[in-house]
């Protein structure tokens, strides 16, 4: 991975930390009770978007870290990784291959993951947020953590995949190459001295 790609990888990770940090702050779950009243619980034209988390339990940490380990593994073809990411298309396979190959080529592998603080998402109640600690092979900055979001596979499967939002930030699926060149830095224009 070239220097700009290395930089882009860490910028994407920083974006995940910032976005997830802002997205998860200030959430509280209150107890709801059922009571009959003459006053409607919602006013006409206003819908409630609050939904209870699923009746199933939170996923085990190793279920989530297995998703990430498989995504980082360059021995698994990108096309076989598509089920690991919500709404991934066959076009995403190239990006997944580039991502895992770049990790390998730049000495990040082996890479291990630990999932902590697993909780239901406050944006999508069926999704979960987890703080993921990443341990990379390089000795400098070898461990870092950031929040990631996971979504359940569509039924009948009982497993999890990386949410589209997290994958977009981490892997830059919006870009056809999967990697972004940073904008060229322009030298400041000298101002004439008087």
Swiss-Prot record:
<keyword id="KW-0564">Palmitate</keyword>
<keyword id="KW-1003">Cell membrane</keyword>
<dbReference type="GO" id="GO:0005886">
    <property type="term" value="C:plasma membrane"/>
</dbReference>
<keyword id="KW-0732">Signal</keyword>
<protein>
    <recommendedName>
        <fullName>Putative lipoprotein LppK</fullName>
    </recommendedName>
</protein>
<keyword id="KW-0449">Lipoprotein</keyword>
<feature type="lipid moiety-binding region" description="S-diacylglycerol cysteine">
    <location>
        <position position="27"/>
    </location>
</feature>
<feature type="compositionally biased region" description="Pro residues">
    <location>
        <begin position="185"/>
        <end position="194"/>
    </location>
</feature>
<feature type="region of interest" description="Disordered">
    <location>
        <begin position="174"/>
        <end position="194"/>
    </location>
</feature>
<feature type="signal peptide">
    <location>
        <begin position="1"/>
        <end position="26"/>
    </location>
</feature>
<feature type="lipid moiety-binding region" description="N-palmitoyl cysteine">
    <location>
        <position position="27"/>
    </location>
</feature>
<keyword id="KW-0472">Membrane</keyword>
<comment type="similarity">
    <text>Belongs to the MTB12 family.</text>
</comment>
């Amino acid at each position: 991975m070239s220097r700009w790609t290395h930089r882009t990888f860490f910028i994407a990770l920083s974006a995940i930390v910032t976005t997830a940090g802002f997205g998860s702050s200030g959430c509280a779950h209150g107890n709801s009770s059922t009571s009959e009243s003459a006053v409607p619980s919602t006013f006409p034209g206003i819908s409630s978007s609050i939904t209870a988390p699923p009746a199933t339990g939170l996923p085990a940490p190793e279920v989530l870290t297995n998703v990430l380990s498989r995504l980082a593994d360059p021995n698994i073809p990108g096309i076989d990784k598509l089920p690991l990411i919500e709404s991934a298309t066959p076009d995403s396979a190239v990006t997944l291959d580039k991502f895992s190959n770049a990790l390998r080529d730049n000495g990040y592998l082996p890479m291990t993951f630990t999932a902590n603080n697993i909780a239901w998402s406050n944006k999508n109640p069926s999704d979960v947020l987890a703080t993921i600690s990443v341990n990379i092979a390089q000795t400098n900055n070898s461990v870092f953590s950031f929040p990631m979001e996971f979504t359940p596979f569509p039924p009948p499967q009982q497993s999890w995949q990386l949410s589209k939002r997290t994958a977009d930030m981490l892997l830059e699926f919006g870009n056809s190459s999967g990697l972004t060149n940073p904008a060229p830095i322009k030298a400041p224009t000298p101002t004439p001295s008087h």
